[in-house]
Amino acid sequence: MANAKRITLYDLQLASGCTISPFVWATKYALAHKGFEVDIVPGGFTGILERTGGRSERLPVIVDEGKWVLDSWLIAEYLDATYPDRPTLIGGPSVKTLTKFLEGWLWRTAVTPWFGCYIKDYRDLSLPRDHAYVTSSREAMLGRKIEDVQAGREDRLPHVPPTLEPFRQILRESKWLGGDRPDYADYRALAVFLWTGSVATTPPLTADDPLRDWLDRGFDLYGGLGRHPGMHTLFGLKLRPGDPEPFTKEPARGGLASRNTGPASTRAETEMLTRARAAH
């Protein structure tokens, strides 16, 4: 088994063929990280149980030499356990815990508001045979008509980018969440933005957002894995008078953002505090 070169992946796709599920995106990157060739089984939101032979109602699912593995986290753990000779995805229990924390924060901070901003696009871009299912299931989830949920998104979209500042700060200090090389933390976080790009018919981030460097590098990994032609650009959000600043223009100062190596390293913060005290 350790010499297996190909793994089958059951995908969740839009009409364009672009993957919509962030969990499938994370698994695609995990398989690429491990160096596997992937045989894709296409499909949309409906018919999953039939496609998987009654084994699962949710995706992703992989098949590795006859062994079926469900759930994106369980798949990543399976790949590390079964193929320890290939690059590691999850470096240990602490990495797994911190990755889950970051992913949960991103879902609360970005996915939840963006889901409401793109829910009609989410339905309209799905396979035509899936429209009725997406409409009924998401309206039951949200308690309102899809069109009503998405309405007014131009007023809501500008309020999401400022909330991502802690994430930008991490990436100002590190090339990848995994350090010098991407790991499963990067893939789980990238999956949030890949999901967004699959449905974002109007951009959620400004053109100059500092996240662009990490996102572009992440989408370019493994031969441009995140560059499906069905993807929409994430960048180009137009701000209006009164909209909040999308990100901090100056690097943060202080203990959370810099290391104390002596007075020279803290001078800028000290001068700022001195000016503030004098102003009062």
Residue ranges of each PLM-predicted region?
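GST-like domain detector, emphasizing the conserved glutathione-binding G-site
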Residues: 1-133, 248-280
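A short, terminal or domain-edge coil/loop segment
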Residues: 58-61, 90-105, 141-154, 227-245, ...
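Short, hydrophobic secondary-structure boundary micro-motifs
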Residues: 87-91, 177-180, 205, 227
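GST-like fold's C-terminal all-alpha helical module
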Residues: 107-216, 252
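Long, positively charged, glycine-interspersed low-complexity recognition regions
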Residues: 196-280
